[in-house]
Design a protein with these regions (language model features):
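Aromatic-lined ligand-binding clefts that engage carbohydrates, nucleic acids, or primary amines
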Residues: 1, 12-14, 110-137, 164-166
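Short beta-strands within extracellular/lumenal beta-sheet-rich domains
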Residues: 1, 100-112, 149-151
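Signal that preferentially marks extracellular ectodomain short beta-strand elements
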Residues: 1-4, 25-26, 151-154
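Surface-exposed, short loops/turns at beta-strand junctions within beta-sandwich domains
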Residues: 4-8, 156-160
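An acidic-aromatic loop/edge-strand motif
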Residues: 7-103, 126, 163-222
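Residue-level preference for beta-strand/loop junctions
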Residues: 102-104, 145, 160
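Short hydrophobic beta-strand segments in globular cytosolic domains
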Residues: 141-142
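A short, polar/charged loop-to-alpha-helix boundary motif
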Residues: 145-157
Length: 222
């Protein structure tokens, strides 16, 4: 769709024939009465999410606010904006990357004097990614996956300019969800993605919200 997106509102329309054979509807009806019938339920056709890929940021139209278990929440909607060239430490997801999934490399060049290159480390108060890697002046360090959240910089720094690169790898949580629960869940199932499901949730999902809940990720320095 490059070259077809315009400034302002854009509408993407997909047209298809969506039908299910009669036995699917019969099984759904049986699921209301017999719990075991859920194991026989599948769909010949499914409607999946549409993912927009590209070099851009996503800015929430409403403010973010904290939620449970290191998550945060916004009422939405969202606007595409140019990708940032710089980010601040802390939660990067609220800096126009709420749905971002994959790897992000952050780099900074610092200048050190003679007495500033010894006994140095990079420490984090908590993990802000699944894996955090570091390269100091091109030298790769062992990645962080668990505590202690610390990179030892002994022997890697020199007087003058030093290039520090941090590579964050996150998971699919903020892309695949569940996005419409009021915080971060300890466990999820089919009902976590549905507002009202008599089959998988026993009725109305009381934790449902029309807003969006994400999990934080970023650089949380100690």
């Amino acid at each position: 769709i490059s070259g077809k997106i315009v400034k302002g509102d854009n509408v993407i329309t997909l047209v298809t024939d969506f039908v299910q054979p009669q036995h699917i509807y019969d099984t759904i009806k049986d699921c209301y009465e017999f719990e075991a019938m859920r194991n026989k339920l599948w769909y010949d056709r499914e409607i999946n999410e549409l993912y927009l890929l590209g070099d851009f940021g996503v800015r929430a139209d409403k403010a973010y606010r904290p939620a449970s278990n290191r998550s945060f929440y916004t009422d939405g909607g969202f606007t595409l904006v140019p990708a940032r060239e710089t980010v601040m430490d802390g939660n990067i997801a609220v800096q126009d990357y709420p749905f971002y999934t994959g790897k992000m490399t952050l780099e900074k060049t610092i200048t050190l004097a003679d007495g500033e290159i010894e006994n140095r480390s990079i420490e984090f108060s908590r993990m802000g990614a699944v894996i955090t890697k570091a390269r100091i002046n091109g030298k790769a360090l062992s990645p962080l996956t668990r505590a202690p959240y610390r990179f030892d910089l002994s022997g890697l720094l020199h007087t003058g300019k030093n290039k520090i690169e941090l590579e964050l790898t996150n998971n699919f949580r903020n892309l695949l969800g569940p996005l419409h629960l009021g915080g971060e869940s300890y466990s999820v199932g089919p009902a976590s993605f549905q507002h009202d499901s008599k089959i998988f949730g026993g009725g109305l999902n009381r934790g449902w919200t029309d807003g969006y809940a994400f999990l934080e990720y970023g650089l949380f320095f100690k």
